[in-house]
Amino acid sequence: MVKAKTVYVCSNCGADSPKWIGKCPSCGEWNTYVEEIVVKEPVGKRALYGVSDGGKVRPVLLRDITSEEETRVDLGDRELNRVLGGGLVKGSLVLIGGEPGIGKSTLVLQTVLGLKGLRTLYVSGEESSRQLKLRADRIAHENPDCFILCETNLEQIFVQTKNVQPDLLIIDSIQTIYTEVVESSPGSVSQVRECSAAILKYAKVSGTPVLLIGHINKEGSIAGPKVLEHIVDTVLQFEGDQHYMYRILRSIKNRFGSTAELGIYEMRQDGLREVSNPSELLLTQNHEGLSGVAIAAAIEGIRPFLIETQALVSSAVYGTPQRSATGFDLRRMNMLLAVLEKRAGFKLVQKDVFLNIAGGLKVNDPAIDLAVISAILSSSLDISIEPGISMCGEVGLSGEIRPVNRIEQRILEAEKLGFSRIIIPHNNLKGFDTSKCKMQIVQVRKVEEAFRQLFG
C-alpha cells in the first residue's frame, strides 16, 4: 500500500521541509511554506512523459551530434515573432505570464486561430468549449485545424495529444493542470513542478512546441515554484494597465533569442492589434502651448519610439511635499530633483511634484532623464517647450548629460515623426553620418546648457 506523508513546501523556490519554517533557508523568503500531502509511487507505475525512460537514453559524443539550424514556426504575428526571436522553435516550451484579464488567453487564441496549415490543440482548464467559441467569434478568425480540449487531468491530455498529433500545443493554464502522480490540489508547488516537467519532456521527445499560460502572484512574478521559470525555454511577460488600451509583451528569458525584444499591442473589442509604430499612438497633438510636457526619444528593448513626459509642479498644501511618479522610478525622480536643486539652482523643496509617462507605459530607459527634468522645470516656470523639440540623455549626479546608446535610432525616429530639433549629449555622434539627417541636432554637456536651449 502506498503511504502518504505530509511535507511543507516553499511556494517561492520549491524547497521542502518535514516541518513548518517561518523563513525559507533556500531563498530567504518569509511565510512561504505551505502544507502538502505527497504520495510516493513506484517508478514503474508512473505514466507521465519522461518520468522513466527505462534505460533507453544513452550518452553520445558531442562530435557525433549533427548541428542543424533550429526550425522555427511562423506564428503570423510580427510582434510575437519578434519577441520570440523570429518564431517558435520546434520542441520548445514557452511560458506566458501576466495579470488576470490582461489578455493572455486572447493573445494566444487569436494567434492560434490565425495559423494556416498547422494542426493545433488548445487545452483549457479555465473555460468551457462554448466560452472559447464565443471568444473566437469575437476575434473573427477561423482555423479549421484548431482542436479544443477542456481538460485538467494531465494523463488524459497526453492521451489526446497522441490521438490529435498537434503541431502546436497550448495549455491554459499550468496552474489548473494536475497529475494523478501527486496527491495535492491543482496549482500547488508539487503539481506545477511535476506537470511542467512532464510537459517539457513531451515537447523535447515529440518536437512539438508548447505554449503555457501562467498566472502571476501579488509581487508580479510567475505564480508557483521558481523551477517553473528555470525549466522552460522562454518566459514572456504580458503587461499593461487595464485602464489603457496598450499591452506590452516582454521577453524575460529566451534560450533561442534576445531578451531585449519588445512587442506592443492595442486592445480592441475584436482582440489585440499589432502596433508597428507606437510613437504615433503615444504622442498627443494637443499639448502645444502647455507647460510641463517634454518629448523623449526612448528605446525599450531594441525599438525606438517617442514618449510624452508630463509633469505638474505646484505649491505644497501640506507640511511635507508630495512626490508621485507613474510609469517612472520614483527614487530616480527624487535624484533628478536633487540634481535640479544642487546643480541648476532651482528650489523645489516646498513644491509638490507629479510625474506621468503618457499612455500607461513603464519606461526604464535612463535616456529619458533629460525629458523628465525639462518637463518638471517647464511646469515650475510655467513656460512651455517649443513644439518640434525632442530630447534624450542620461543625467548624472554632477549635472552632466551622459551619452546614451543607439543614438542613431533615436534621431531617425524623431525625424520620421516630423520633429525639427533634438537635444542630445555631447560627443554622442561618433560614427553617425549626420548628412543623412535633415533635423537640427543640438549637443549639450550640462543641464544648464539644455535649459538655455529650451527656455532661453
Question: What is the predicted function of each stretch?
Answer:
Residues 2-12, 16-82, 89-95, 102-112, ...:
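Peripheral, non-AAA+ core regions of ATP-driven protein-machinery
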Residues 99, 125:
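P-loop (Walker A) phosphate-binding loop of NTP-binding proteins
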Residues 120-124:
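Conserved RecA-like ASCE P-loop NTPase motor core of nucleic-acid helicases/translocases
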Residues 129:
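Divalent metal-dependent catalytic cores for phosphoryl transfer on phosphate-bearing substrates
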